């Protein structure tokens, strides 16, 4: 028993290994991006690295890397190890070039994504259990109360006000591909509803900036719909910081 525990401990120790890694993210059915990065550390069951594209806890990424064979849980004879990974931790930080970057911690979940991900890439997941077959993490779809701030967001003060903002959409390279000056329908510390003519699918990430103060936050699109008035709206959840409400009411 002691020997098995020691082996399990060794397997889960992080190994500092700066291997190149190709990161694929399907933000929505119609949009994906690829970014090259380097590992900070790795175990057979997860890894850490840094990317410049926004993402969020609960999303799935596909990693491709020349993983040492002794650290693999499958595909031991393939040159490249292609593994799906769940974002467990995300820390935004300012890079030396002034650009925002994200330190990501992921858990490896297997060779293939869940069927629900194929249908809806914006689906968010949580860890459910460990596979007895390969010791990788098994997933289930996250419930509303488990997705970051969803539960507390519903209790947040939501101000019904037309706050002047700009909405920016990113392309596959992370550059701004479209933008629009508009106003909010309502706003809270954790999210907002904005009127916009931009065509942005659920699951995409956008930047929302106050045209009055210059305050800028990254947000995930939770829904895109038209209200009873026929005007299209985006329902946004802020993912990197909160929006201060002081002085707005």
Model-based region annotation:
Residues 1-249:
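Structured alpha-helical
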């Amino acid at each position: 028993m002691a020997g098995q525990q020691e082996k399990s401990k060794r397997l889960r120790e992080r190994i500092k290994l700066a291997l190149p890694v190709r990161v694929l993210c399907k933000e929505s059915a119609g949009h994906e991006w690829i970014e090259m990065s380097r590992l900070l550390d790795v175990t057979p069951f997860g890894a850490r690295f840094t990317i410049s594209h926004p993402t969020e806890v609960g999303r799935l990424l596909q990693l491709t890397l020349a993983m040492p064979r002794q650290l693999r849980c499958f595909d031991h004879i393939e040159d490249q190890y292609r593994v799906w990974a769940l974002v467990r931790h995300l820390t935004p930080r300012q890079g030396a070039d002034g650009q925002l970057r994200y330190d990501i911690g992921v858990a490896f979940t297997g060779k293939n994504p869940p069927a629900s991900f194929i249908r809806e890439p914006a689906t968010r997941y949580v860890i459910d259990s460990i596979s007895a077959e390969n010791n990788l993490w098994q997933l289930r779809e996250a419930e509303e109360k488990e997705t970051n701030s969803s539960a507390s967001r519903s209790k947040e003060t939501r101000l019904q006000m037309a706050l002047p903002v700009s909405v920016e959409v990113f392309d596959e390279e992370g550059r701004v591909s479209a933008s629009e000056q508009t106003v909010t329908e309502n706003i809270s510390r954790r999210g907002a509803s904005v009127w916009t003519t931009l065509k942005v699918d659920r699951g995409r990430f956008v930047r929302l900036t106050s045209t009055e103060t210059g305050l800028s936050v990254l947000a995930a699109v939770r829904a895109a719909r038209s209200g009873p008035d026929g005007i299209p709206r985006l329902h946004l959840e802020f993912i990197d910081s909160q929006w201060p409400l002081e002085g707005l009411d």
